[in-house]
Swiss-Prot record:
It is found in: Plastid, Chloroplast thylakoid membrane. It comes from Psilotum nudum (Whisk fern). InterPro entries: Cyt_b6/f_cplx_su6 (IPR007802). The chain crosses the membrane at residues 4-24. GO terms for cellular component: chloroplast thylakoid membrane; cytochrome b6f complex. Component of the cytochrome b6-f complex, which mediates electron transfer between photosystem II (PSII) and photosystem I (PSI), cyclic electron flow around PSI, and state transitions. PetL is important for photoautotrophic growth as well as for electron transfer efficiency and stability of the cytochrome b6-f complex. The gene is petL. This is Cytochrome b6-f complex subunit 6. One of its GO terms (molecular function) is electron transporter, transferring electrons within cytochrome b6/f complex of photosystem II activity.
């Protein structure tokens, strides 16, 4: 259970970081 929760947290962190990077690249393109 704990390993599944930590794996889900890691996956969520990777998804958020990818989304932030994507938004950051789009903002750089707009400038």
């Amino acid at each position: 259970m704990l390993t599944l929760l930590s794996y889900f947290g890691l996956l969520l962190a990777a998804l958020i970081s990818t989304l932030v990077l994507f938004i950051g690249l789009n903002k750089v393109k707009l400038i």
